[in-house]
């Protein structure tokens, strides 16, 4: 299987360079994807993964950072664990790609998927309205919003093990394993619509949707479609308002159609 570690290690080990050397050797024996983060306080650019770009330039649509906090440890892949909180401070969507120094950098979950199938790069498609989709060969197309973000969900259960349980009885047969920290004061949980989640839980959530092709996403045409449907229904109700025998059935039918359409869009991963 493919292993990933969401613990950030941007600085040398305070116990000495020997500890970093031991970690580097361990990563040579057991390849893993490491987590990096894009930062407004960094100026250097991290390791770059090749990208096949289709359509326009995606840089103008992506979240941009001046630098990437990085380390020199051996790793088969590196992915970013940055989140993008909404106006209320709650994280509901995560970017799959960000920009820095004129280059593209994939998220941790996307990098886990790329390394898992052994592909040297991933594909990104950009249209006039923004980022349209990303793709790892052998897996479904990943539809995103115009900024390459997808929605996270809170209804997925994962098999979990503590470090002590893993040492006594290591997990076997898993295609992907993500290691994270839950110690208070060491890592801060991320506020989400489903409650506080640890970074490795968010990445596991995104990875699950990427593998199954079920990541909820709001297409760029969704706001215009919602406005158009609302105006059409209002116009129909205004025309039939003086005839209750017409307006009542139309109103009930409209409510039912909106509920059915919303459920269908959600099940189709378009909402």
Regions found by a protein language model. Give the residues of each.
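Aromatic-anchored segments of alpha-helical transmembrane domains
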Residues: 254-266
């Amino acid at each position: 299987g493919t292993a990933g570690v969401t613990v950030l290690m941007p600085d040398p080990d305070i116990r000495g360079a020997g500890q970093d050397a031991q970690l580097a050797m361990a990563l040579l024996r057991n390849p893993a994807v490491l987590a990096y983060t894009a930062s407004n306080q960094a100026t250097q650019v991290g390791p770059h993964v090749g990208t096949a770009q289709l359509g326009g330039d995606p840089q103008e649509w992506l979240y941009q950072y001046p630098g990437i906090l990085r380390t020199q440890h051996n790793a088969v892949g590196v992915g970013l664990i940055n989140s993008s909180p909404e106006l209320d401070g709650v994280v509901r969507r995560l970017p799959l790609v960000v920009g820095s120094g004129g280059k593209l950098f994939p998220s941790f979950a996307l990098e886990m998927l790329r390394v898992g199938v052994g592909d040297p790069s991933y594909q990104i498609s950009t249209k006039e309205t923004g980022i349209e989709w990303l793709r790892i060969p052998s897996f479904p197309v990943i539809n995103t919003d115009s900024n390459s973000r997808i929605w996270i969900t809170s209804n997925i259960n994962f098999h979990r093990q503590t470090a002590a349980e893993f040492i006594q009885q290591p997990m076997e047969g898993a295609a992907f394993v993500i290691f994270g920290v839950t110690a208070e004061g060491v890592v801060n949980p991320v506020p989400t619509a489903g409650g506080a989640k640890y970074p490795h839980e968010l990445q596991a959530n995104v990875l699950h949707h990427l593998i199954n092709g079920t990541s909820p996403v709001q297409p760029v045409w969704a706001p215009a479609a919602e406005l158009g449907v609302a105006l059409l229904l209002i116009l129909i109700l205004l025309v039939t308002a003086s005839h209750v025998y017409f307006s009542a059935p139309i109103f009930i039918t409209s409510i039912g159609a909106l509920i059915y359409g919303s459920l269908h869009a959600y099940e189709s991963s378009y909402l």
